[in-house]
Structure formats: C-alpha cells, structure tokens
Amino acid sequence: MKRFTAQIRHSYDTIVRMCRVQDDTFCFGRKVLMALLGLALTVFGAWNLSSVAGLVFALVGCWLLVSLNFPAKNRAQSIREALHGEYPTNRYEFYDKHFVLLAQNQDVVDYGKIMRLVEDDGYCYLFVSAQAAYMLEKASLGTELSRFMAFMEKATGLSWTKPYKLTTFNLKTILELVRGGSKDKKK
C-alpha cells in the first residue's frame, strides 16, 4: 500500500547542499581537524609575521579555514558536469517495506538498506552509504511531513539527525564522532 509521495526538483544549489550535508554527516572529523590546523597555523603565523615563514604559515592557515567546504563544492561541480546542466526531478513513492524512485531508471529500495536519516530545514536525506543518498523536499510532503518522518523512523529503526556544524560543535558531537556516527540504529 502506498503511504507517501514526495519529490524534488534538483538544481545546482540542491546538489551543492546535498554534498555539504554528506560532508557534514560523514566527514565532519576531517573538517574539524582542518579547522583546528588552519586556526593553529594562522595564530602561529600571526605571531611571526615579520618573517617569511610566519607569513607563509598565516596564509596556509587562512586558506585551510576558507576551504573547509571545498571537497563538497568540488564534488557538486563534478556532478554538475556529469549532468550537463540537465537537473532531474525525482519523484518517490513510499510503501510499507520499501520506496520507489520514479525516474528514467526506476529504483526500488528496501528500508533496511538505509543507513542514516538526516534532515535539515528544507530537505530529508535517506543515506544508503556514505557516498549515496536520496534527497527529497520537505515541502513536497505538505501536512504529511511529521507522519512521514515518524513512519521512516519506524520502518528503518533509525532516528533522524541533523548534519554536524562547526557552529554547534560540542562534547556530545565529539562523543558521537568517536563512536563512529550519530544515533544510527535505535536501541
């Protein structure tokens, strides 16, 4: 029995957003290390600006800090080139045991294959691996959004999480990273 339908009209912005969420979800440790190294190099360089080495350290540190999202942007650019500027509209139908991506190549996915449920303010991401996710627009679910999210938690045994952010980084985030991710499977 069909339970829900959802869709997304992709654009370059949605591709960039998905790549960033992927990075923030699965590569956040690398991002934190890059930020800490960048900060350390910038501070060290600022104390020694009178020397060439200090200037180089400061420049490299600043470059690391401003390029935290470079891997995601680079991946998004590669996807844009592969799509030749033709962004798809993906429609989904959710059933009791699986969902179907209605596209040129129809894809049937059992809920057991989903490894992580992630949400941000506008989209839901159903990750089947660290490199692949199905993205859908929350607005396309309308008033059914909360029921859909509860259904997905029950169907997958997972909890919805938000992507990690440097601005909300805390001890809880560190503990989740050490354990290898956030609340992947409900207990």
Model-inferred region functions:
Residues 10-12, 96, 121:
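Residue-level signal for tight coil/turn positions that link beta-strands
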Residues 99-100, 107-124:
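Phosphoinositide-dependent membrane-docking surfaces
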Residues 93-94, 118-119, 128:
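Generic beta-strand structural signal
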Residues 1-41:
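N-terminal membrane-targeting/pre-transmembrane regions
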Residues 125-187:
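A membrane-cytosol interface segment of integral membrane proteins
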Residues 24-84:
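Alpha-helical transmembrane spans
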